[in-house]
Amino acid sequence: MNQLRILVADDNQFMRTAYKRILETQDDFEVVCMAEDGAEAVEMALELVPDVAILDVMMPKMDGIEAARQITDRYPQTGIVLISAFDDLAFVSAIMKDGATRRAYILKNSLDDIGELIRVVEAVVDGRAVLDPRIVQKLMALYKGNSRPELASLTESEENVLKLMLEGYDEPAIARSLGLPREPVEALASSACEKLGLTEQNGTDRTPWAVQTLLNLCVA
């Protein structure tokens, strides 16, 4: 079994240690380095090339968003998990650009469930884009409040599927969560994406582009 090599960066030593302990409950996860600021995180990432970098947004010397940019500019295959206390959509937009995959933006409060960090890392490694549920709720509320007439309204079923897509769940997991067969979930996901103006030209996994579209609509 190949080890998943992870970098953890947070200026709070307690949080660094806590994340490491949670991650290493998984036999195939290995925290290969821990950094206490953004600049050190970039230096370590460029040397060790981790599979995933978990970065606090607010760090001294360099914030997590800039650290993520520098890491992925050099090694785009490295997955990024940004952890933040802020649900500011401008922060989210800064990391979720141009249909970016293998990226997550998660709020610290969500990590009270220790399994959530593991789920998010696994989703990022699988190539998905992941947003915190609170961010998803905020985006969907803004989307529904958008009065532009060309925007088709989502049905309740489409919205339920889209929310879980944006949270980084794949279609089999969405089907299990909603208690539906996979085929109706696939149809609902497709129709929701079409209402956002996404087509097959955006790829088989349109979730990253759905994230980008909603951010474009909701972030001034």
Q: What are the residue ranges of the model-derived segments?
A:
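The feature encodes the CheY-like receiver
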Residues: 15, 60, 88, 199
